């Protein structure tokens, strides 16, 4: 699947201050084929396994208490 990587806090992986290869490295770490820093804000990955958590507007938990 394709999508934005999310951390344990439910927020997208930020790439604003990261080196150019950061997102591609993070995407390959979860067995994705490739990735990039979308609009210099968040890592977007391609061809990841279905078990990888990705950000969704419907299930967004970023910044919210559990």
Swiss-Prot record:
Residues 1-63 form the LCN-type CS-alpha/beta domain. GO terms for molecular function: sodium channel inhibitor activity; toxin activity. PROSITE patterns: LCN_CSAB. Expressed by the venom gland. Disulfide bonds join 11-62, 15-37, 23-43, 27-45. The modification Cysteine amide is found at residue 62. Coiled coil: none annotated. InterPro entries: LCN-type_CS_alpha_beta_dom (IPR044062), Scorpion_toxin-like (IPR003614), Scorpion_toxin-like_sf (IPR036574), Scorpion_toxinL (IPR018218), Scorpion_toxinL/defensin (IPR002061). Beta toxins bind voltage-independently at site-4 of sodium channels (Nav) and shift the voltage of activation toward more negative potentials thereby affecting sodium channel activation and promoting spontaneous and repetitive firing. This is Toxin Tppa2. It comes from Tityus pachyurus (Colombian scorpion).
């Amino acid at each position: 699947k394709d999508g934005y990587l999310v951390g344990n806090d439910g927020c997208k992986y930020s790439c604003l201050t990261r080196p150019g290869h950061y997102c591609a490295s993070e995407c390959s770490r979860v067995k994705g084929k490739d990735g990039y820093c979308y609009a210099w804000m968040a890592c977007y990955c391609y061809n990841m396994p279905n078990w990888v958590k990705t950000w969704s507007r419907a299930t967004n938990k970023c910044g919210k208490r559990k």
